[in-house]
Amino acid sequence: LLIRIKNLCNKNIVIVPGGGSFADSIRDVYDKTKMSENLANKLALKSTELFAEYLKELDNDLCLIENPKNFTKEEICVWLPSKKLSQNNSFKNNWDSTSDSVAAWLANKIMAEGIIFIKSLKDFKSKNKLYYLQNKNILDKNISIYLSGYNGLIKIVGLNILKKLEKESSWKGFI
């Protein structure tokens, strides 16, 4: 997927990865121990950075970056959010904020042209209401806070993205 994105897109791309199984492990430890919710959420946010390191291992051309002001057009950047968000009171660091909220928060801050959420979906309606996506746990419960006032394009794609990207020579009509 990273290779296809690099070949098809001539825009700034910032990846905000989820924490995946790393975050799931933190939640499991939190549920089974006396770990504070504050620490658990902090570690879950850091787990996105572990996944970022894994992406970097898969594609050494990716740049890992902490400061959103340092994104470049020449590279696909993967944002490491824990330092910035731990210093920012406008982000709700709790279990209702996942990487969905992190991506929406960042998109709003940098006035991104669009956000693409890549989800493990097979079948998906082309238009959905936000509350429906939240109730189905497709998007997190806090995302509406960060999408408020956001004017960019929002797309949610599932497993079908790989098949579509194989056939496309550009992003037009796709995003």
Where would I find each of the regions flagged by the language model?
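Nucleotide/pyrophosphate-binding catalytic subdomain
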Residues: 1-174
